[in-house]
């Protein structure tokens, strides 16, 4: 009998380590339920076969990773990374603004071509995030002003429906200093049709933030800015109705609600 077992093992030749990996990789999260609100970040158990440089967090419940949930217009179940997540619709309300310059509402072919080109530049800047910075997710507000237009509102410009407002507008007079809410590297500076003087910071591991309508930019492309370091001044450039900071945060491929990120103890609240 012992001889037969040895002969069988020689024919199969399955390395013990491979066998263990096969068993581990069959683990699923079928018995676990995950859900969150539109435009928010949640935590899920880290993937078993994660990359060495993946951003993970040790908790009392095990190793977790963060995932972003997209803005949705109805409850939706989606797959994020290796789990299914229910994204709950949120009624963020609506915003109606009037822009006197009709050329900035109904774009000419030239302006549309410019806007498309600039959109591609922004998309390119967001396509590759550094792993040399590890974000703490302990954000501070970039300006002290109150929120004038929150995340998620359905916008109407001159009575016409437009895309939802997936950013946070903060009040500020022209010249008000804007600071980095988190350590980051300057990966884009531009003067764009919609957003005027614009700056993007890469905070590492797929976390970016954008600052629009600035009157002046105080940093250079490639600069590494520490948290609370000044990056520019509030302005009214681009398509605006008045001076303010238009602050957008991107994580894990989605625009997320910046107002949530500046709450005290934010990271611990989602782990």
Task: Enumerate the predicted regions with their spans.
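Sterically constrained small-residue positions within well-ordered secondary structures
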Residues: 21, 33-35, 48, 69, ...
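Non-catalytic extracellular/periplasmic "stalk"
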Residues: 31-146, 150
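N-terminal secretory signal peptides that target proteins for export/translocation
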Residues: 1-12
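Catalytic cores of peptidoglycan-degrading enzymes
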Residues: 140-271
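Sec-dependent signal peptide recognition
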Residues: 13-20
């Amino acid at each position: 009998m012992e001889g037969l077992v040895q002969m069988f093992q020689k024919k199969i030749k399955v390395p013990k380590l491979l066998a263990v990996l096969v068993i581990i990789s069959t683990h699923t999260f079928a018995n676990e339920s995950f859900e969150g609100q539109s435009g928010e970040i949640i935590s899920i158990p880290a993937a078993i076969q994660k990359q060495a440089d993946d951003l993970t967090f040790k908790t009392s419940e095990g190793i977790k990773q963060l995932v972003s949930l997209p803005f949705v217009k109805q409850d939706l179940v989606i797959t994020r990374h290796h789990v299914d997540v229910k994204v709950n619709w949120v009624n963020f309300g609506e915003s109606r603004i009037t822009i006197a310059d009709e050329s900035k509402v109904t774009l000419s072919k030239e302006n549309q071509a410019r806007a498309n080109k600039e959109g591609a530049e922004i998309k390119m800047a967001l396509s590759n995030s550094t792993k040399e910075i590890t974000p703490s997710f302990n954000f501070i507000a970039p300006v002290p002003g109150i929120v004038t237009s929150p995340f998620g509102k359905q916008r109407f410009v001159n009575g016409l429906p437009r895309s939802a407002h997936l950013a946070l507008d903060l009040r500020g007079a022209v010249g008000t200093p804007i600071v980095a809410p988190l350590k980051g590297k300057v990966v884009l500076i531009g003067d764009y049709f919609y957003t005027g003087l614009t700056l993007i910071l890469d905070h590492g591991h797929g976390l970016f933030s954008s600052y629009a309508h600035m009157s002046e930019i105080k940093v250079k492309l490639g600069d590494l800015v520490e948290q609370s370091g000044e990056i520019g001044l509030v302005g009214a450039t681009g398509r605006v109705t008045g001076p303010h900071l238009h602050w957008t945060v991107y994580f894990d491929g989605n625009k997320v609600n910046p107002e949530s990120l500046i709450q005290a103890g934010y990271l611990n609240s989602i782990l």
